[in-house]
Amino acid sequence: MGNELQHRTVLLDEAVDSLVTRPDGIYVDGTFGRGGHSRAVLARLAPGGRLIAFDKDPRAIETAQRIEDARFSIVHDSFASMRDALAARGVEKVSGVLLDLGVSSPQVDDPARGFSFRADGPLDMRMDPTRGESAAEWLARASVQELTEVIRDYGEERFAFQIAKALVARRAESDRLGPLDTTGELAQIVGHVVKTREKGKDPATRTFQAIRIHVNQELADLQVVLDAALSLLEQGGRLVVISFHSLEDRIVKRFMQAHASAPAVDRRLPIRAVDLPSPPLKIISRQFPSEAEVAANPRARSAVMRIAERVTP
């Protein structure tokens, strides 16, 4: 319960205001977390409305199962399964999809989950600790090339190659030192390599982000769920996405722009603009947390919310 109380939902009112356009509609919260957005959506829904939420984290599922509301249901799976999960429930179209991306405060603040370099814990980083390969397991087998690509591409870390070499060198010492399986040692290795310091940022920040994204397939799942949301939204339905770093936001921005623009046509072809299919989306807005919200919750500082609306049937 303590972790739930510590978690502050970012852009709560702004997200729900943008999402709920029909109180009797069917809505999807792709990232239940500790339920802040879901509870606020339920408060806006009419008796005939419905909310289906998703989360991979077993602790989030435990929290969701305590919500006693016939209009609400929870799916223990990645939001990448949204299309199939809704079809299995007889849902063909929805009035809105909300995605609050990234890792939640309770996950970061619990050393046992292995997301944070601020407190020592097992090197796990899985959103669902019961499924898939942990960070420690991946680090125990990844090549220098794979490590470099992940840390460079997902962490935007310019010392990626040097970090990768240091990790493989540490692995060669496993017989003597034991496996690399704690967040504290990973942070220490990265700190020895990254000599420059970004103001207010630990040198391990980018590497931890990169490994977490890789272990959880976050960017691949994001692309899948954006495509699913586009096909599921009814006319007038809203897609609301909150992201916390440039990689996520870039994917969301490009997706919305691509589907809010008319297809490019060779001007030499005898095709009139009115004969082209209308783009399915209209971009509504981009919003940021207020100064007051950032002051109350510093983790909101990097949040960006993008909203688009389905304008075609």
UniProtKB/Swiss-Prot annotation:
<dbReference type="GO" id="GO:0071424">
    <property type="term" value="F:rRNA (cytosine-N4-)-methyltransferase activity"/>
</dbReference>
<feature type="binding site">
    <location>
        <position position="79"/>
    </location>
    <ligand>
        <name>S-adenosyl-L-methionine</name>
    </ligand>
</feature>
<comment type="function">
    <text>Specifically methylates the N4 position of cytidine in position 1402 (C1402) of 16S rRNA.</text>
</comment>
<dbReference type="InterPro" id="IPR002903">
    <property type="entry name" value="RsmH"/>
</dbReference>
<dbReference type="InterPro" id="IPR029063">
    <property type="entry name" value="SAM-dependent_MTases_sf"/>
</dbReference>
<protein>
    <recommendedName>
        <fullName>Ribosomal RNA small subunit methyltransferase H</fullName>
        <ecNumber>2.1.1.199</ecNumber>
    </recommendedName>
</protein>
<feature type="binding site">
    <location>
        <position position="100"/>
    </location>
    <ligand>
        <name>S-adenosyl-L-methionine</name>
    </ligand>
</feature>
<feature type="binding site">
    <location>
        <position position="55"/>
    </location>
    <ligand>
        <name>S-adenosyl-L-methionine</name>
    </ligand>
</feature>
<keyword id="KW-0698">rRNA processing</keyword>
<dbReference type="GO" id="GO:0070475">
    <property type="term" value="P:rRNA base methylation"/>
</dbReference>
<keyword id="KW-0489">Methyltransferase</keyword>
<comment type="similarity">
    <text>Belongs to the methyltransferase superfamily. RsmH family.</text>
</comment>
<dbReference type="GO" id="GO:0005737">
    <property type="term" value="C:cytoplasm"/>
</dbReference>
<feature type="binding site">
    <location>
        <position position="107"/>
    </location>
    <ligand>
        <name>S-adenosyl-L-methionine</name>
    </ligand>
</feature>
<keyword id="KW-0963">Cytoplasm</keyword>
<dbReference type="InterPro" id="IPR023397">
    <property type="entry name" value="SAM-dep_MeTrfase_MraW_recog"/>
</dbReference>
<keyword id="KW-0949">S-adenosyl-L-methionine</keyword>
<keyword id="KW-0808">Transferase</keyword>
<feature type="binding site">
    <location>
        <begin position="35"/>
        <end position="37"/>
    </location>
    <ligand>
        <name>S-adenosyl-L-methionine</name>
    </ligand>
</feature>
<dbReference type="Pfam" id="PF01795">
    <property type="entry name" value="Methyltransf_5"/>
</dbReference>
